[in-house]
């Protein structure tokens, strides 16, 4: 890494995650307890990989209860009941042990007795009702520990509504039907589409992200961004934007991304002259955008594929242009703020050479390339497994130039095994990939010069398992919400009531949906937020004429920006803790920087060509991109108050208004927007030339 980039202490980073990221709020373990927990996490991740590759033919009645049961088991061992318990080293109270094994018992009972339960259908007996209630309560308690109270409140309200609806229809069977639908029915409830997607795809991508992090790709991305923009105006802030966008490809957590890259970029931004609030806000805004950055988007994107029936690969393609616009907006804000403050870039001699860096470390991108290629031919889960395999393979590349046999030869062994098993012997793809993974791990015992080692493999699997628990719990809880909506036809009722009221104003419907997503996102994880909004508000937007993908992308975007929207802006708070800035001011500044996230969804909702939907021509798409970028530039200039020099207040209003007019895709609004932006820009340009001419004389 370039020596110009200073970072905070690793212990400080861990402490920040412990405070702000619930996935890091685990027990304090040392010695044998820590080793035992690591073994459990490794077994958990291995089970997920084996279920995806080797025993993929198992029925959902087996896979899903086993997955949820194991998740709750390790979850109760990871997350203590209270902050007081978390402060005590190696403390496992008896009730946590009981809850952990009770989780295994209840959910494994379902897997073992699946045939009997299927035959019973909604005529389940007292035993099944009691076990179902216990299973739901176990999930709720772990949700309290791992995700927080707000999601429980939301789920509780929906459950009460479901119970009331069933009681009105038939009081005698209300409890039985409620438990059956929420716990045993695979079409709604805990085991519905959210947890199915989590078990099939999301966990595998989380494990992939953990392995990519271990390869050192994060450091490579920071250096790559530094080589691209480090020497330009406000270079360190631009480095933060680019590196966070790249890191977002494998990090699904805004907070973790902010803390991880922010520990490097924020101190550097402060050093060159950026205010602490601005430095923290840049990192928070860019890191939050990581969840919309293809090819590995946030967990909610996989749920979108399942709910809409649109292939994940198509969603990734549709997300490209909005992501480009989002980060372009932040980049322009940073650029004009840097010009306003007169900030220069980093010294050129401290910046890595772009092509030398690619030649040295470009191979770290191979797993990402493999992932993109595989998505065109295989399921998302299988594609993730291929990428995990190649993460292991590239990690076998040695750093000892004098031992070429091991440096180059070892990575070729698992690759050769894959080719022979898959293409020569013709065994099934999943088994071939799994055996090749095992061979790669065995090869790690034969070298000390490579990144890959048995310890790194264990850490990668452990990290993937630890990060999966909170997401899986949120998916299971979200399933309860979607189950109630499906069971009671609440979604259809809301569409019938709201659409006529909002028919006259599509902007009003979009604005109300935006507010609902942001408010809900302040207390509910992105995954659950998306499921709730996709179940309730997306159908309303679709009924009003917005295309399916555009409606779901709209709620997806606004569920994410809650991480930087005050008063509950966890990513902004994480950045402020590193920068030692005011958290509220940081959140407000981050919201200003990420203004694109509040504008872009309106653009693709009103003109879905931005998502490659019904594109009239390539030129029409280029026109949308150009006007959108000009609009983002106008807003950036208006908000920073600087183009070539200070911009008067009335011109700032013109620039902001011009950017807003360019949201509407009609030719008239585009012309007005271009004029409103063009006049102040031309005035600034002419004034700047006069000043230069005067200075030259």
Where do the model's predicted regions map?
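Conserved, well-structured core domains of diverse proteins
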Residues: 1-122, 129-133
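Long, contiguous bundles of hydrophobic transmembrane helices that form the permeation core
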Residues: 2-37, 42, 317-466, 570-660, ...
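Membrane-water interface regions at transmembrane-helix termini and the short interhelical loops
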Residues: 51-56, 77-89, 116-117, 135-149, ...
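Hydrophobic or amphipathic alpha-helical targeting/insertion segments
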Residues: 100-105, 113-116, 124, 129-184
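Membrane-interfacial loop-to-helix junctions in multi-pass transporters
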Residues: 126-130, 188-201, 227-241, 272-278, ...
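Core transmembrane alpha-helical segments of multi-pass membrane transporters/permeases
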Residues: 141, 145-146, 150, 154-168, ...
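Transmembrane alpha-helix interface/packing and boundary motifs in multi-pass membrane proteins
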Residues: 209-213, 244-253, 285-291, 482, ...
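Hydrophobic transmembrane alpha-helices that form the pore/transport pathway of multi-pass ion
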Residues: 222-290, 296-303, 309, 526-558, ...
């Amino acid at each position: 890494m370039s020596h110009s980039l200073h970072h905070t202490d690793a212990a400080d980073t861990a402490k920040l995650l412990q405070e702000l990221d619930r996935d890091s709020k685990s027990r304090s373990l040392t010695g044998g307890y820590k080793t035992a927990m690591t073994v459990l996490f490794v077994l958990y991740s291995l089970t997920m990989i084996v279920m995806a590759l080797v025993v993929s033919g198992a029925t959902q009645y087996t896979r899903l209860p086993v997955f949820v049961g194991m998740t709750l088991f390790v979850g109760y061992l990871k997350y203590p009941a209270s902050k007081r318990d978390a402060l005590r080293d190696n403390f496992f109270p008896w009730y946590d042990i009981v809850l952990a094994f009770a989780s295994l018992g209840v959910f494994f009972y379902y897997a073992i007795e699946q045939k009997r339960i299927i035959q019973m259908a909604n005529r389940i007996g007292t035993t099944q009702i009691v076990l179902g209630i216990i299973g739901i309560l176990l999930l709720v308690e772990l949700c309290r520990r791992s995700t927080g109270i707000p999601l429980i409140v939301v789920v509780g309200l929906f459950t009460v509504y479901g119970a009331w609806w069933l009681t009105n229809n038939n009081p005698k069977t209300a409890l039985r039907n409620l438990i059956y639908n929420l716990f045993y029915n695979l079409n709604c409830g805990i085991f519905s589409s959210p947890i199915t997607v989590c078990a099939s795809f999301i966990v595998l991508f989380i494990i992939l992200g953990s392995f990519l992090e271990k390869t050192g790709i994060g450091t490579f991305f920071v250096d790559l961004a530094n080589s691209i923009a480090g020497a330009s105006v406000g270079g360190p802030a631009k480095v933060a934007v680019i590196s966070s966008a790249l890191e977002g490809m494998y990090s699904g957590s805004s907070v973790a991304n902010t803390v991880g890259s922010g520990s490097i970029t924020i101190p550097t931004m402060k050093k060159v002259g950026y205010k602490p609030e601005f430095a923290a806000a840049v990192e928070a805004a860019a890191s939050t955008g990581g969840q919309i950055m293809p090819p590995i988007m946030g967990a909610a994107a996989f749920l979108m594929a399942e709910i809409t029936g649109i292939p994940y690969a198509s969603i990734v393609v549709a997300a490209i242009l909005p992501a480009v616009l989002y980060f372009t907006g932040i980049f322009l804000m940073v650029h004009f703020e840097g010009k306003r403050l007169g900030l220069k870039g980093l010294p050129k001699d401290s910046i890595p050479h772009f092509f030398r860096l690619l030649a040295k470390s470009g191979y770290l991108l191979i797993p990402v390339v493999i992932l993109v290629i595989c998505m065109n031919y295989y399921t998302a889960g299988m594609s993730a497994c291929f990428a995990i395999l190649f993460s292991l393979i590239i990690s076998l590349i040695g750093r000892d130039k004098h031992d070429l046999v091991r440096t180059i030869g070892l990575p070729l062994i698992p690759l050769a095994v894959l080719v022979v098993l898959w293409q020569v012997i013709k065994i099934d793809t999943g088994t071939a990939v799994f055996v090749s993974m095992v061979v790669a791990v065995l090869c790690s015992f034969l070298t000390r010069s490579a990144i890959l080692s048995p310890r790194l493999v264990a850490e990668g699997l452990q990290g993937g398992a630890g990060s999966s628990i909170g997401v899986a719990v949120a998916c299971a809880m979200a399933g309860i919400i979607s189950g109630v909506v499906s069971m009671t036809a609440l979604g259809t009722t809301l569409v019938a009531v709201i659409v006529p009221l909002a028919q006259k104003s599509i902007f009003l419907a979009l604005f109300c949906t935006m507010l609902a997503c942001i408010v809900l996102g302040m207390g509910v994880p992105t995954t659950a937020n998306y499921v709730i909004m996709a179940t309730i508000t997306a159908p309303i937007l679709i009924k009003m004429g917005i295309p399916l993908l555009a409606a779901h992308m709209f709620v997806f975007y606004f569920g994410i920006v809650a991480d930087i929207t005050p008063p509950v802006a966890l990513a902004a708070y994480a950045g402020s803790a590193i920068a030692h800035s005011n958290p509220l001011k940081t959140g407000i500044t981050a919201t200003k920087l990420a203004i694109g996230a509040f504008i872009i969804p309106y653009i693709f909702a009103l003109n879905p060509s931005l998502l490659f939907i019904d594109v009239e021509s390539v030129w029409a798409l280029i026109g949308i991109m150009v006007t959108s970028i000009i609009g983002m530039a106008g807003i950036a200039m208006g908000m920073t108050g600087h183009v070539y020099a200070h911009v008067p207040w009335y011109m700032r209003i013109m620039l902001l208004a011009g950017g807003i007019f360019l949201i509407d895709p009609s030719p008239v609004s585009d012309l007005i927007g271009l004029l409103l932006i063009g006049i102040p820009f031309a005035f600034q340009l002419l004034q700047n030339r006069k000043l230069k001419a005067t200075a030259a004389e």
